[in-house]
Regions:
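Conserved cytosolic headpiece of P-type ATPases
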Residues: 1-30, 38, 42, 172-175
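Juxtamembrane helix-loop transition segments at the membrane interface in multi-pass membrane proteins
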Residues: 4-15, 36-74, 104-109, 135-160
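Juxtamembrane/transmembrane-helix boundary motifs in multi-pass membrane proteins
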Residues: 13-17, 21, 79-83, 111-123
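Pore-lining and gate-forming transmembrane alpha-helices of multi-pass membrane transport proteins
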Residues: 21, 25, 29, 33, ...
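Loop-to-transmembrane boundary segments
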Residues: 69-91
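Long hydrophobic alpha-helices with heptad-repeat/coiled-coil character
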Residues: 84, 98-115, 119, 174-176
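Terminal membrane-proximal soluble interaction domains of membrane-associated proteins
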Residues: 164-176
Length: 176
């Protein structure tokens, strides 16, 4: 998920244009993420895990609504939650495109040459904590402002992705 997209983008010859390079690498990263999630969702064992993931979201919604945490109450809530880790991963992938492009541009300005693949890998790895921290803050903000029309538009891709990583749980799973 990290080195392969960089190597693939490097192979396209886009290493001189930081934004183009990171759009290619980020696109590959997004395809790998969605493809991996879809592929593992085909396995029955993982499908069951995704049912528990849906139960977790229903439980969180029940708790946040301030109603009794019972199977009957939880059943009425949706399985797609705006502050899900699946959404977080998508935010990381998308935000990294732009923050990595900025880091690459600064590096190129500082050393006056394009980065090697290993230098780019090290640069991106060093910026990853910033990407993760900002992504987490955006995820928290999306939870607080989830009813705002712009927020609903921005969180939609993460909710769509959760259609892969969550399944409708059984009552036994909700009870856990």
């Amino acid at each position: 998920f990290f080195f392969l997209p960089l190597a693939a983008a490097q192979a396209t010859g886009a290493e001189r244009d930081a934004l183009q390079f990171n759009l290619i690498a980020g696109g590959i990263r997004a395809i790998l993420l969605v493809g991996y999630m879809w592929l593992i969702s085909c396995w029955s064992e993982i499908r069951r895990v995704f049912e528990y993931h849906g139960a977790e979201h229903k439980s969180i919604f029940t708790f946040e609504a301030g109603v009794d945490l019972t199977v009957e109450e939880a059943r009425s809530f949706g399985r797609l939650h705006p502050r899900c880790g699946t959404s977080f991963l998508l935010i990381v992938v998308l935000l990294s495109i732009f923050l990595f492009a900025v880091a690459d541009s600064l590096f190129a300005d500082f050393v006056a040459r394009p980065q090697t693949l290993l230098e780019r890998f090290a640069t991106h790895l060093s910026v990853l904590p910033l990407v993760s921290g900002l992504s987490f803050e955006l995820l928290k903000l999306s939870g607080r402002k989830r009813n705002h029309p712009l927020t609903r538009l921005l969180i939609a891709p993460g909710l769509w992705l959760q259609r892969i990583t969550t399944r409708e749980p059984s009552d036994d799973q909700l009870e856990v």
